[in-house]
Each structure stands twice: as C-alpha cells, then as structure tokens.
Amino acid sequence: MVRIAINGFGRIGRLVLRVALSRSNIEVVAVNDPFITTDYAAYMFKYDSTHGRYAGEVTHDDKHIIIDGKKIAVHQERDPANLPWGSENIDIAIDSTGVFKELDTAQKHIDAGAKKVVITAPSSTAPMFVVGVNEDKYTSDLKIVSNASCTTNCLAPLAKVIDEAFGIEEGLMTTVHSLTATQKTVDGPSHKDWRGGRTASGNIIPSSTGAAKAVGKVLPQLQGKLTGMAFRVPTVDVSVVDLTVKLQKETTYDEIKKVIKQASEGKLKGVLGYTEDAVVSSDFLGDSRSSIFDASAGIQLSPKFVKLVSWYDNEYGYSTRVVDLVEHVAKN
C-alpha cells in the first residue's frame, strides 16, 4: 500500500484525491492547504460544478475530512518543510499547488519526511514524465519528478506515434484550452500577461504555452522540432490540441488513422483514444484518457503535411495520469 499526501487542494488536488480513492493500492493519508478548514475541504470535495457531486459519503471533524468512513488528515501549513510527512510515513507527496514545482522548492517535502515527490505541473528543473511516453526512463534514484502539463500529456502520445511511424520534420501546435483558475472573472491586473487579465468568460484569449517545447524533454528526438501557442476559451473543462506537422515520409490520412487506432488499442490503450464520431468538447468531460484522436476532424494537404486533432479533459485526464505516475514511481 502506497501512502500519499496531497499538497494543494485546488482543481487538480481534489480530482487526484477522487482518482486515488478508486485505486486499491493507494492510501491517501493527508491533504494540506493553508487556505481551507476541514468543513470547507469536505464541501469542496463533495460538490464539483464540472464533474458532479461525489457519489459516496463526505463528512469531517476538527482535523480530518472523512470520505466513505476513511479519515484523511487536513493540515494548514504554508511551508511544506513544516509538514509531518515523516511521522505520517508518507511514501509520495503530490504537490498540486503550482508553487513548489522546481527541485529546490519541492525538496521541502523530502525535508519534511516524504520519500518522493510528484509535481503536478511542468518544471524547468525536475525531470518530466508522461505516462505512455517516457515513464520507462524513470529510475529509483529520482526523488522528485514532474507529471508535465495536461497539454503535454495530450500532445506527447500523439507525437510519439506519428514520429515513430512517419517521422516528424517539424510542427506547430495550438491548444484551444478551457479556462483555468489563473484567469480573471472580470478584467483585472495581470502584469506579466496583459491579455490574460481580460474576462475569461467573455473572450477568446491568445496565450503562450510551453507544452509543445516540453515534448522535446520527454521525447528527445523531437527537441527543437515543435512549438506552440494557446487560445483560452470560455468553456469550464475539456481542451483540444491541433497539431500541424510536416512529415518525413509520404503517407495518406487513412494510413495515419490506422496507425493511431492501432496504438490506441495496443500499447497506449487507456492513454491514447480514437474516435470517428461527430464529437464536441462536452463529450469528453470525465474522460480518463490523456489524448483522444478525432479522426473526422483532421485534414491533409499533401502527402507530408497534415493537421491532427486530439481532445483531452485537462482536469480529469491529467489527474488520472498523476495517480498513474505515482503508482509507477512507487513500484520502481
């Protein structure tokens, strides 16, 4: 049984808890968030505007949230170094704050007594792993790892399949991305990203993303071959990647579909999906896969130039991969 703790009880932290509770080999021991009390933690876990009410029983006492009779300690520490991970015998701390995402800051969990750390955000210093793509490169000496971003988790499996079959010369990615907590409900100050300060619910907002470049970190053969940008749009969840690539080998769109379908039914089953249905974004709410290729949405201009479209639940799919990575780290 792997004993885990979750630091940061936001969108990803709460969904990671939902997913972890469904795994028989994981015990969630504690959550930490300096901004919430146990009664509020129970409320936020029980009710979810996007993914619906939790199906089980959720209560609380002064020091715990109690889910289906299972007590989970709630801490309110701002500094992870002060958390009781040692006395609670935590195997893996999951940091979903978006704050402690580099090796030096995530080290605070190790200093507090956790054996290992999984960061639920891209990191410029911690090694990044995408389940289905490069988790086999993980070695037990790595104490702190990153699960990359939701968009990298969508793009990387698709890029891996295409590159292995046809070779990617170069490519541009656009993610049409649902709004997130970093955006504003009305126009407000956002000094680093002026456009990002505009009303989230009423605008399509161009934004930067490192997701495509990060693919080069998990698939070194694609280093320098991909870059991308984002449009933030007024949907609450589910996003879609548009990958436009120049291939090394000539092919047909039917052959591309065949290769992706085979991968989705084989080694990438559960990570990469495939559909030919006339789907829209809400059809993927709660989908646990990282990337669902939309065969009827893509187009081909010439034998080496194609546009590929793949959907992802940027909350639930990503949270599922976080727990998958935790399991992989624990076993290896």
From Swiss-Prot:
- Site Activates thiol group during catalysis: give positions: 177
Q: Name one Pfam family in it.
A: Gp_dh_N
Keywords assigned: Cytoplasm, Glycolysis, NAD, Oxidoreductase
Top-rank EC class of the record's enzyme: oxidoreductase
GO MF annotation terms: glyceraldehyde-3-phosphate dehydrogenase (NAD+) (phosphorylating) activity; NAD binding; NADP binding
- Where primarily located? cytoplasm
Residues the record marks as active site: 150
Among NCBIfam families, the record links this protein to: GAPDH-I
The molecule here is called Glyceraldehyde-3-phosphate dehydrogenase 2
User: Can you name the source organism?
Assistant: Candida glabrata (strain ATCC 2001 / BCRC 20586 / JCM 3761 / NBRC 0622 / NRRL Y-65 / CBS 138) (Yeast)
Q: What is the lineage of its organism?
A: Eukaryota, Fungi, Dikarya, Ascomycota, Saccharomycotina
